[in-house]
């Protein structure tokens, strides 16, 4: 699992989406919510973007994509290991 954080321009490039479409997909539950990096900056785990893109390439249904997004966001909670 990659620990790289992608900023919005990178996510737009990786997904082939415009800025407004990225945020629309988040609202629709088709893309994970960004994580805060600072007071005015956010990013997305690269592994999540890769998983979503792989599902899109595999032509998963909208319902399957929404379930994947829910699973990815739920998995964030268990990501801290010391």
Regions found by a protein language model. Name each.
Residues 27-28, 54:
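Residue-level detection of the helix-turn-helix DNA-binding "recognition helix"
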Residues 28-35:
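Short, solvent-exposed alpha-helical "recognition" segments
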Residues 1-16, 21, 40-42, 46-82:
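Basic Lys/Arg-rich amphipathic helical interaction modules
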